[in-house]
Amino acid sequence: MSIKSPQTLVSEALNEVKTITPEEAMKLNSENKCNLIDIRDGVELEKLGAIENSFHIPRGLLEFSIHPESSYVQNNQIDLNKETVLFCAAGGRSALAAKTLKEMGFKNVSHVGGGFGLMIQKGFKTKT
């Protein structure tokens, strides 16, 4: 039996999903053209903070939370007509998550290469 490594899975996902820069994500977010979704776990948010104007949906709940019948979508917290931009700490989990959303049928999905750390370096602000 051959088991793929996480690195192989991420590499495969990166070949299938759109990767955007932190600067591109910042522009989309400032123009209110995207749902900026932080898929890091709660411990990471507590330790490092959350990006302003982002939604927190942990990776393990993403598929359930972003489905059109979910309360996030039903309560207009997430607008599925906008681009869905995912980020994690460094970009691996968000690439995998973006691939999963594409498999679910979402068309306008991307992830931020470099993740939270690079986003902070490029000027994203954290919530206080």
Regions found by a protein language model. Name each.
Residues 87:
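Short, surface-exposed ligand- or partner-binding patches at beta-edge/loop junctions that are enriched
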